[in-house]
Design a protein with these regions (language model features):
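Short, ordered, surface-exposed loop/turn motifs in non-cytosolic proteins
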Residues: 253-278
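Catalytic cores of extracellular degradative/oxidative enzymes
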Residues: 312, 316, 341-387
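A short, amphipathic beta-strand motif
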Residues: 243-252, 261-263, 303, 332
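Long, low-hydrophobicity ectodomains and other hydrophilic envelope-associated domains
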Residues: 63, 74-239, 382
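Extracellular beta-sheet/turn segments enriched in Thr/Pro/Gly and aliphatic residues
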Residues: 230-239, 320-343
């Protein structure tokens, strides 16, 4: 055999060997992947529950993705069905969490676009690969989601339910711009199911507009955090400016006044979020007060406004669709059912504790008169004395 022929045969066998090695690696990877897949029936069942919950929240996945999911389910082929479902749902995941066989939690940022709305809730998914097969509760914490309760100046109003609270500084308030909710209402749960792969729903709220960063810490029971903060994810969000609404509030005589408003979306979220309110809006009550001509920023969506002005006025409701464009004017006409002042009866509270009793020690702490006067006007209280 000629030398040139020997060289050609040698190259041919090298190519064949290389192709066989690649094929073997692919088959091994496919086998490992198949071993790590959840059982098909419960995975499809959980996927359907996830879609039902997203529909209920008013945040369904895209129509074409829902159609692709149904096509994947109809395949009834474990490897292809599960892989196709994951490929579709992973686009909506802000977090990918892995629990290794030793139950250590590791987290990274997912493929979803980190975008929020000022004063609005945004829904994302969390993908969890549970290699340990544990059934503990999944927990998510963030220092940016800590309380800003009762911050006036540079301290917190004491509600005396859990002892003397730590001070919350103005810097803390700036950093605590976010609220967070792991959605666990039926059919979703907070506990892991022990399936190898499952998805959770998380909702995030931004108090602010602009660029904001947050850290998220994941755990699944005690001592499950991975070493080196690998269970923590830092994400930079783009928080879009919401639509500013102009309130026009008139009393029974058609004169401008102040009223109480409880604002809800169809999921029951209260706006602005009570956890992120700053004076003059207070965290310990659902309502906020707005006088004629004032504004509030809300993201696009449908809201129910419940408004009144204390016990002398009827409680009325109005459904409002907020969309982009020019700031809409919202008109609220109050309706009084009784006027005790015509019988020489006047309402009042001459003993208003603005910060429990701490203001006896530090008069600067608590609610300022300028903030409290809005509440008095909004409840049609004739006399109010702040201690």
């Amino acid at each position: 055999m000629r030398k040139s022929h020997i060289i050609l045969v040698s190259k041919f066998y090298k190519k064949i060997t290389f192709c066989l090695v690649i094929l073997l690696l692919i088959l091994q990877r496919a086998e490992i992947r198949a071993q790590s897949l959840p059982a098909l029936q419960p995975f499809i069942f959980q996927t359907k529950q996830l879609l039902e919950s997203l529909d209920f929240l008013g945040t369904p996945i895209a129509v074409n993705d829902k159609s692709k999911l149904q096509d994947a389910i109809n395949k009834n082929d474990t490897l292809n069905t599960i892989t196709d479902i994951e490929d579709i749902l992973d686009k909506y995941c802000l977090f990918n969490v892995e629990i290794n066989p030793e139950s250590r939690v590791y987290a990274v940022q997912g493929a979803a676009k980190p975008e929020l709305w000022q004063n609005g809730w945004q829904t994302f998914l969390i993908k969890i690969e549970n290699q340990a097969g544990i059934t503990a509760k999944i927990q998510v914490l963030s220092p940016q989601a800590k309380e800003t309760f009762g911050v006036f100046g540079d301290v917190r109003v004491n509600n005396f339910t859990q002892g003397v609270p730590a001070k919350v500084t103005a810097k803390d308030v700036t950093d605590r711009w976010m609220d967070m909710n792991l959605y666990t209402k039926q059919p979703m749960k907070q506990e892991l199911s022990s399936m190898e792969v499952e998805y959770f729903i998380i909702q995030l709220y931004s108090r602010d507009a602009g660029k904001r960063k947050a850290r998220f810490n994941f755990s699944a029971g005690e001592a499950t955090e991975d070493l080196g903060f690998r269970n923590a994810v830092d994400i930079l969000f783009n928080c879009r400016q919401s639509t500013k609404l102009i309130f026009h509030v008139l009393d029974e005589n058609g004169k401008p006044t102040t009223a109480s408003f409880i604002i809800r979306d169809k999921q029951g979220h209260i706006y602005p979020s009570q956890a992120k309110r700053l004076a003059p809006d207070f965290y310990f009550q659902q309502q906020v007060y707005r006088k004629d001509g004032e504004q509030m920023a809300l993201p696009e969506g449908k809201y129910t406004f419940e408004y009144t002005r204390g016990p002398e006025y009827l409680v009325k409701t109005k459904t409002i669709n907020v969309s982009g464009g020019a700031p809409p004017s919202l008109n609220f006409a109050l309706e009084r059912w009784i006027d005790p002042s015509k019988l020489d009866w006047y309402s009042g509270d001459h003993h208003i504790h603005a910060a429990g009793c701490r203001h006896y020690e530090t008069p600067s702490e608590g609610v300022d008169p300028a903030d409290m006067i809005r509440h008095l006007f909004g409840e049609a209280v004739n006399v109010g004395c702040i201690l």
